[in-house]
Regions:
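N-terminal Rossmann-like FAD-binding beta1-loop-alpha1 element of flavoenzymes
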Residues: 9-34
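Conserved structured core elements
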Residues: 19, 93, 146, 194-195
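Short, hydrophobic/aliphatic alpha-helical segments
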Residues: 29-41, 198-201
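Conserved N-terminal/central alpha/beta ligand/cofactor-binding core
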Residues: 37-180, 184-186
Length: 203
């Protein structure tokens, strides 16, 4: 037996990218279903490295997005896709501002300004550090992904997003060269679910 779920947008993955995609799709007026192969909030994104980098008013006034893009591409051996690198660099300041608006906390100086540091591979000081959520020890690692995911999960839960945990993608459903949904396995109930979606996002 199998079940059918209809949705405007199907998001596959519950990490940072998946949560942000679900938020955006919902805010644009779509019905959204997110399937997560484990539990929401327990993805690879939770173990994000110690800092995030973005050009903005918090950093060096001489820094530019062009400089950040050169650093990103050159230290990646020019293997990165330039269009994606450009999007990452240009969107990062707005995403940092958005996370701050949603309640994320940064390491700060005594005067209250965001504490910055100059990380390896960067031409300018552009690295910000999220404060870990309570209970995460600094000597174990800052793990800002926990802090970021807490914020994103709260935003997802505050919206009418249908989150389905422990559901694993089996295959995409394709008709005439277009993806029209997916087939997934509900691991708790051992039931196949067919998702009919106008758009499917692999996040």
């Amino acid at each position: 037996t199998f079940e059918i779920v209809k949705t405007d947008v199907l998001v596959v993955g519950g990490g940072g990218a998946g949560c942000r995609a679900a938020i955006e799709a919902h805010d644009l007026g779509s019905s959204v279903t997110m399937i997560v192969k484990g539990r929401l909030g327990h993805s690879g994104c939770t173990f994000n490295v110690g800092t995030s980098a973005a050009v903005g008013p918090w950093g060096d006034s001489k820094d530019t997005t062009d400089s950040a893009m050169r650093d990103l591409l050159s230290h990646g051996g020019f293997l990165g896709i330039q269009d994606l690198a450009k999007t990452l660099v240009e969107e990062s300041p707005d995403r940092i501002t958005e996370l701050e608006k949603w309640g994320i906390d940064f390491q700060r100086n005594d005067d209250g300004s965001i504490a910055m540091h100059h990380a390896s591979g960067h031409s300018f000081t552009r690295n910000l550090t999220f404060k870990p959520r309570p209970g995460v020890k600094f000597d174990y690692g800052i793990l800002p992904g926990f802090a970021m995911m807490d914020i994103l999960i709260n935003q997802v839960k505050s919206r009418d997003v249908n989150v389905m945990d422990d559901v694993t993608l089996v295959d995409l459903v394709v008709n005439e060269g277009k993806v029209i949904g997916a087939v997934a396995l509900d691991c708790h109930r051992n039931v196949l679910t067919v998702f009919s979606a106008k758009a499917t996002i692999l996040a």
